[in-house]
Amino acid sequence: MDTEGFGELLQQAEQLAAETEGISELPHVERNLQEIQQAGERLRSRTLTRTSQETADVKASVLLGSRGLDISHISQRLESLSAATTFEPLEPVKDTDIQGFLKNEKDNALLSAIEESRKRTFGMAEEYHRESMLVEWEQVKQRILHTLLASGEDALDFTQESEPSYVSDVSPPGRSSLDSIEMAYARQIYIYNEKIVSGHLQPNLVDLCASVAELDDKSISDMWAMVKQMTDVVLTPATDALKSRSSVEVRMDFVKQALGYLEQSYKNYTLVTVFGNLHQAQLGGVPGTYQLVRSFLNIKLPAPSPGLQDGEVEGHPVWALIYYCMRCGDLLAASQVVSRAQHQLGEFKTWFQEYMNSKDRRLSPATENKLRLHYRRALRNNTDPYKRAVYCIIGRCDITDNQSEVADKTEDYLWLKLNQVCFDDDGTSSPQDRLTLSQFQKQLLEDYGESHFTVNQQPFLYFQVLFLTAQFEAAIAFLFRMERLRCHAVHVALVLFELKLLLKSSGQSAQLLSHEPGDPPCMRRLNFVRLLMLYTRKFESTDPREALQYFYFLRDEKDSQGENMFLRCVSELVIESREFDMILGKLENDGSRKPGVIDKFTSDTKPIINKVASVAENKGLFEEAAKLYDLAKNADKVLELMNKLLSPVVPQISAPQSNKERLKNMALSIAERYRAQGISANKFVDSTFYLLLDLITFFDEYHSGHIDRAFDIIDRLKLVPLNQESMEERVAAFRNFSDEIRHNLSEVLLATMNILFTQFKRLKGTSPSSATRPQRVIEDRDSQLRSQARALITFAGMIPYRTSGDTNARLVQMEVLMN
């Protein structure tokens, strides 16, 4: 049967194929088995999708129908809903429909107002959001910058370090966080401050810091020599450093000092070169710069170079001799060369004599214009680089030519450009012949920048470039970013600060290096306070004495709230290091104060100690604050804080070395000393303090089982009523008690009731009446104890203080047991 069925199916398929082949208009599509299977799967999935949709509709109907909802009605209602929005354009009206026109105009006005208000609201919200994001981002940038600067790595060094340790990184006691160089600097700062505090003449901080350079490498020695040279200027009288630094006289002095440093450095370089090659140098003749330069040229220019002009002097090119004599800072030696070759040099001798004899190395305007004209006509494309360089220096012209054939090193380039800097504007100089110090500073700091000078390989070179162009703040900020050089940057800043040459930021929230509105374009300000605090953060916890020496430089600085920065830093240092006794002094047993390190800096230590105590109090360090206020003889604050400390521990059981035992001993020591010396505080605070001490004694006796002594104490204190007659008086007196006393009321009532209940049980447990103790006495005592217990219950209900429900329940329970 199956065979016949398959045969019939095959026959039908062949017939269908034959019919299909007969239709020539249709294209033939041949598919393999895999393609046929895929086509079948697609047809099946369509069928399943329709089926699944119908199944889903059925399930939805069942689900919603069980809740009483008709899905067909819901579908109709949804389809009938209009999708038109409120702000859909209004329907047009006929021109003669006045009512419709007025209605449309009114609706249009309302919709326009709403839309305009919506746009304005969204615009304001977006603007506020943008401003908020900018402010928040600026704060985040500040925090990132501070974190990077305060870290132990270079600001941009993100290399993977060793795995972090989760053990406390606090250094062991006695171990310093300062390395040998930092410690050497700290000693010099100590010596400097000792002289200042003692009233001696102000020592030279540059010399003190430079002595540390002997322990380090040559770069540090050169750096301090440069700092000493650049700070040796006469400041003009001014109210602040900005006016002084902006004056023409001071800026001219800076350039003069920088040239002097570069010239002396180059002379030292020629000496080292000559004495390192004596055979080739052939040093001889009269000692001096001229002979030194001749010998140097024997090494530098051993053979005649092509393009050099105007002959030779003693076998060396004239202009090379003149240039190198000037480079060594010896114009007299250069004039000797000019005199020997005057016949080949034309008018140059006259110009050079005028240049050499002028006060500020500047030709007169007429001579300068004449020289510049000669240079432009005959020398601009001259083949002798030394001749062009000398003319550009003397005439201060052609500032765009860097003279790279001669000035091939950064120091030579600096020397050449500083020689071309001019300060007076006579109106005759063209832009290509005029270079101001501000222009040169901008070129080095902004146009070239760090990337040009490969600061990672030669950090001191970039520092030198900035420092010699009087950009002290930028130089310090750059050096400070490098961990190994940070200590040098800080001490350079201290030197400039003490010499009143440092431009400081007007606020402590400013970045480390900033430009403030109103300052000249190339002036930068250094956040000196932040610089010092970032530096001391490394060692203030392990070396508080050294940190204190640095903070002394901030004695005249104020923060944004007008608070003295020295006081603020000292208070933070004491709290951080917990070296209260060492820094602020210690109170002896007789009440006298043993001086601390702070006494070296000021004779009146009370404001500082009070400030530290206030900070400790605000941080919740009440015990330390109380000791500090005691040190400052502030009895009111001492007892006020002691009351806060004693109140929570009053009802606790005393144990050796417990918190209560320590505070009790401290309070007793203060009480004994105050009574012996007649020291009194505010009456209210004073009475609270002594009442708390009495309550501590009461609870100590109570916990020790001495209930009779404890009862005598509570009876004498008159804190709670023990009879109905004193009820009103005790309730009225309770209103005058401080919170420190009130917080202990529940425990006092429970302890007193326990004492009464214990006495009651003891009375009931005694033998029957005897001759010595008649029945009447026992009954009277029994009645008295019940009356006292009832008085406590009544008192607890009358006072304006909410005791806990557990306390009331226990009081009532014991009172009931006594009845």
From Swiss-Prot:
Annotated GO CC locations: centrosome; nuclear envelope; nuclear membrane; nuclear periphery; nuclear pore
Protein name: Nuclear pore complex protein Nup93
GO molecular function, one term: structural constituent of nuclear pore
Record's keyword terms, sorted: Membrane, mRNA transport, Nuclear pore complex, Nucleus, Phosphoprotein, Protein transport, Translocation, Transport
Subunit and partners: Part of the nuclear pore complex (NPC). Component of the p62 complex, a complex composed of NUP62 and NUP54. Forms a complex with NUP35, NUP155, NUP205 and lamin B; the interaction with NUP35 is direct. Does not interact with TPR. Interacts with SMAD4 and IPO7; translocates SMAD4 to the nucleus through the NPC upon BMP7 stimulation resulting in activation of SMAD4 signaling.
Taxonomic path: Eukaryota, Metazoa, Chordata, Craniata, Vertebrata
Family, similarity comment: Belongs to the nucleoporin interacting component (NIC) family.
InterPro entries hit by this protein: Nucleoporin_int_Nup93/Nic96
Subcellular location: Nucleus membrane; Nucleus, Nuclear pore complex; Nucleus envelope
PANTHER family: NUCLEAR PORE COMPLEX PROTEIN NUP93, NUCLEAR PORE COMPLEX PROTEIN NUP93 NUCLEOPORIN NUP93 DEAD EYE PROTEIN
Positions carrying Phosphoserine: 52, 66, 72, 75, 80, 430, 767
Sites bearing Phosphothreonine, chain numbering: 49
A GO BP entry: positive regulation of SMAD protein signal transduction
Keyword Membrane assigned: yes
Primary location class: nucleus
Topological category with respect to the lipid bilayer: Peripheral membrane protein
